[in-house]
From Swiss-Prot:
Entry annotation: catalytic residues: 96, 169
Protein name: Putative malate oxidoreductase [NAD]
Gene: mez
The keyword Metal-binding is assigned to this record: yes
Similarity comment: family membership: Belongs to the malic enzymes family.
Top-level taxonomic group: Bacteria
Amino-acid positions noted as binding a divalent metal cation in the UniProt annotation, renumbered to this chain: 240-241, 264
Length: 548
């Protein structure tokens, strides 16, 4: 090895949270040993952000913009979040879905260094050592987002590249909710991959073996949770894009003892429930009297069903009544309690075919289920494009003046229905929310603004509220409060009004959600911090991209 000395990089330039680039004044440059290390110009943060925005606009592809922002995030954190804050509606699709999916697929090819921690199932004894390399104490971490990348967005298993979904999620926690990025961690739980394309790729950077499952997987996840909670007892443990079976199992196993959160289930449920609450302002029918068909009874669909069930009980229904008014449909059709392959979370909602007069072996599809149940709400979580046909929509309007029809699947190519079609088939009577962003629709001389059931309306505010409360758990009441707070910020008083608030006002939305979550945490006795002026405590906690 050569004894030649190499130039050092000053900490003020190498640490993303400290770096100001050409934002350092000349006095600061002299004090920090940066003389001659930067061009002579000194720019304000606004000027730097304007330069980056100009660079982004000059790029031809969303992936190119994602890569530019990723590198900025890696070296200059304050500027990254300033650009994101100034242009959040435009850049959310770049730093998160859908563009992050493409970035994840190209992770090993484009790897230039990465924020986050990589924990391997092949080295479970190194989990604590890996956390210790960060040099952080028990009071230094508020939020950890981890993924095993088995079910990334709509693209499936992408192994170690899934770290970018955790990084992207944290970026939205900060941009949308003011969660301090210096107090957040992204973690990859690398348990292998079943993606043959990755295993055959000579450049793939993750474990080169099939996904470990069963007892070994469970013990690895348990060890991660125990270690993270012991080292950082105040941290929210957010689980992102786990496979359906593991996502549900982890939440059910640890949700009553640890501050765990699954956005795919709980965040989605809160936002959809918020859209339902807004719809009730139009229909005037109490939640306890609604009947819901869930088309796509997987983890997301039944997670939504669980939250609606809990809200119906809070509205005065018995648990038995609430469950009976939710109708799950999956690949076999309407789910019946005599089916052999029901998942645990589907069982409570499965119907008795004999009570409905359905012969053994007969399949009840969506249209027939609607005729039997006379639902007021139809939720699409199936990823089956076009499943909500004209016949389905007309059946919904036959039993309800203003049916809520929510094609929630992502991306647009997998939506159960196009809003323009639903409005035409329902003669403008349907109340709509979608999972993908949709342009306003003109129908019968009215402009219909279609609310997007985007989880970003919920999870930043939920996280912020939990942090301000120092909550040791995330309870049903807290999620219910978040949904009501989101709905409170939408006012569908006129035909065509959106059922959900605009993400343009995301920081204000998150502040209101955080306050509601905090108050629910106090009410449930899980808060460790109390504040006389809750709103001010929330504002004081929110991190802003600025030079100190």
């Amino acid at each position: 090895m050569s004894d030649a000395r190499v130039p050092r990089i000053p900490a003020a330039l190498s640490a993303p949270s400290l770096n100001r680039g050409v934002g350092f004044t000349h006095a600061q440059r002299r004090r920090l040993g940066l003389t001659g290390r930067l061009p002579s110009a000194v720019l304000t943060l606004d000027q730097q952000a304007e330069r980056v925005w100009h660079q982004l606009q000059s790029l031809a592809t969303e992936l190119g913009r994602n890569l530019l922002l990723e590198q900025l995030h890696y070296r200059h954190e304050v500027l990254y979040f300033k650009v994101l804050a100034d242009h959040l509606p435009e850049l959310m699709p770049v730093v998160y879905t859908p563009t992050v999916g493409e970035a994840i697929q190209r992770f090993s090819d484009e790897y230039r260094g990465q924020r986050g921690l990589f924990l391997s199932i092949d080295e479970p004894d190194e989990i604590e050592e890996a956390f210790n390399t960060l040099g952080l104490g028990p009071e230094d971490v508020d939020l950890i987002v981890c993924t095993d990348a088995e079910a990334i967005l709509g693209i499936g298993d992408w192994g170690v590249g899934g770290i970018q979904i955790a990084v992207g999620k944290l970026a939205l926690y900060t941009a949308g909710g003011g969660v301090d990025p210096r107090r957040c961690l992204a973690v990859s739980l690398d348990v292998g991959t079943d993606n043959e394309q990755l295993l055959a790729d000579p450049f793939y950077l993750g474990n080169r073996h099939a996904r470990r499952r069963g007892r070994e997987y469970d013990e690895f996840v348990s060890r991660y949770i125990e270690t993270a909670q012991r080292l950082f007892p105040r941290a929210i443990l957010h689980f992102e894009d786990f496979g359906p079976a593991n996502a549900r199992k982890i939440l059910d196993t640890y949700g009553t003892d640890y501050c765990v959160f699954n956005d795919d289930m709980q965040g989605t449920g809160a936002v959809v429930l918020a859209a339902v609450y807004s719809g009730l302002k139009v229909t005037g029918i109490p939640l306890r009297d609604q009947t819901i068909v869930v088309f796509g009874a997987g983890t997301a669909g039944m997670g939504i069903a669980d939250q609606i069930r809990d809200a119906m009980v809070a509205d005065g229904a018995t648990l038995e009544q609430a469950v009976s008014q939710i109708w799950p449909i999956d690949r076999p059709g309407l789910l019946f309690d005599d089916m052999d392959d029901l998942r645990d979370f589907q069982v409570p909602y499965a119907k008795n075919r004999h009570q409905l007069g359905v012969a053994v072996g007969d399949r009840v599809g969506l249209s027939d289920a609607i005729k039997i149940a006379s639902p007021t709400i139809l939720l699409g979580c199936s990823t089956v494009y076009g499943a909500f046909t004209k016949e389905v929509v007309e059946a919904m309007t036959a039993s309800c003046k203003h049916p809520m029809i929510f094609p929630l699947s992502n991306p647009t190519s997998r939506m159960e229905a196009i809003p323009a079609d639903v409005l035409a088939w329902s003669n403008g009577r349907a109340l709509l929310a979608t999972g993908s962003p949709v342009a306003p629709v003109e129908f019968d001389e009215t402009t219909y603004v279609i609310g997007q059931a985007n989880n970003v309306l919920a999870f930043p505010g939920i996280g912020l509220g939990v942090i301000v409360a120092g909550a040791r758990l995330i309870t049903r009441r807290m999620l219910h409060a978040a949904a009501k707070a989101i709905a409170h910020q939408a006012n569908p008083t006129n035909p065509g009004d959106s059922l959900l608030p605009d993400v343009q006002n995301l920081r204000a939305i998150s502040t209101t959600v955080a306050e509601a979550v905090y108050r629910a945490a106090v009410q449930d006795g899980v808060a460790s911090r109390t504040h006389d002026d809750v709103r001010q405590a929330i504002v004081d906690t929110m991190w802003l991209p600025a030079y100190d």
